[in-house]
Amino acid sequence: MARGLETFLAVLVLGAATAPGAADPLLREFAVCAGRLSATMEDQWMFDGPASERTAEELSAVVSLIEASMPQGSGRQVMAWRIDAKVAQKGLLQQARFARDARLAETAAARAEALAAECRAMILS
């Protein structure tokens, strides 16, 4: 099965198995940031190795925040949020790298960086 299809099906199954809004909004933000940073790190593995190490540390910090704030039984919802955010961030990064339209590529790169920067700022504050 294609990797993208596996991810889509996982999101679909996890989303159907959990109630929306089942957790704290801050926990959701942590999970979304974990997904974004994970996609960013994977992109950096291919194109900017040294930056991936810094992103891995940031991801580790966010995962620690998730573990500290996640109530028992909310793991599926948290994973669904992470996967959704990772897929979205990965899409932006792919557009930034491979779009034939330069304006689209620039816009996608700026948006991907802005979203990752929001997560980094949350860790530092």
Predicted segment positions?
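Compact alpha-helical subdomains of small soluble proteins
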Residues: 57-125
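Hydrophobic helical h-region of N-terminal Sec-dependent signal peptides
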Residues: 9-14
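Short N-proximal segments of mature Sec-exported proteins
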Residues: 24-79
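N-terminal signal peptide c-region/cleavage motif recognized by signal peptidases
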Residues: 17-20
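Non-transmembrane, amphipathic alpha-helical segments
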Residues: 22-26, 47, 104-107, 111
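Bacterial N-terminal signal peptides that target proteins for export
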Residues: 1-8
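Charged, amphipathic alpha-helical interaction segments
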Residues: 15, 38-39, 124
